Amino acid sequence: MYPVDLHAHTIASTHAYSTVSEYFQQAKKKGIKLFAITDHGPDMDDAPHEWHFSNLPVIPRMVDGVGILYGIEANIKNIKGEIDCTEKMSKKLDIVLAGFHDPVMGSLGMVDNTKALIATISSGLVQVITHPGNPKYPIDIKEVAKVAAEFNVALEMNNSSFIHSRVGSEKNCIEIAKAVLDAGGLIALGSDSHIASSLGNFERVLEVLAEIQFPQQKILNTSPRKVLDFLQAHGKKEITAFQHL
């Protein structure tokens, strides 16, 4: 079990089915020390209003020894790489994930998908790119991995993509992991949990990474401190409540 999950959705995204309290309970039960709540950005049809994200600090930082990161899974909106998380919003969040989602932007083809993703990565607003292996959005994998490493942005291996979402992602994800390794970048593990019982479930992703002998030191989730140092390298403030993690 990895002690950190960076991608989870609550009932604030109405196609997800668990509360923040239920996530804390599952995290404690599973031995997870740190998780991020990353509900969908406001351009998604059933996403929360932007006030949801600005009000996240009402949630206690620590509950029963488990820490929470205030986050968002933003939507990439166009070829310019713009996302539905403004710079003002980003400054109030601990972590910003971003990815392609059909209801907000359909595939533009490999060349323009790649341009959009590179623009998002280089914007300075995003720390993790979610499910980049989605076969609906072909990209130049090597080029994206190169730019992601340059800007210290992690590319996600999304467990949900191997189970019930984004069917056909596995081949692309293997190539992404290899490209990240060649480029000297980082992989982030995400359960993409839409129900609390899935928190920390990386089973299928880890099977794939084991097949290619992907090194642990290039996986972001191996410790809370590694994640927190990564976020501080992106200009995020130190969280005093997590000093012991």
UniProtKB/Swiss-Prot annotation:
GO terms for biological process: bacterial-type flagellum-dependent swarming motility. InterPro entries: Phosphatase_YcdX_put (IPR023710), PHP_dom (IPR004013), PHP_phosphatase (IPR050243), Pol/His_phosphatase_N (IPR003141), Pol/histidinol_Pase-like (IPR016195). GO terms for cellular component: cytosol. Zn(2+) 3 binds at residues 73, 101, 131. The keyword Isomerase does not apply. Zn(2+) 1 binds at residues 7, 9, 73, 192. Binds 3 Zn(2+) ions per subunit. Zn(2+) 2 binds at residues 15, 40, 194. Pfam families: PHP. Its EC number is 3.1.3.-. GO terms for molecular function: phosphatase activity; zinc ion binding. Homotrimer. This is Probable phosphatase PMI1003. It comes from Proteus mirabilis (strain HI4320).
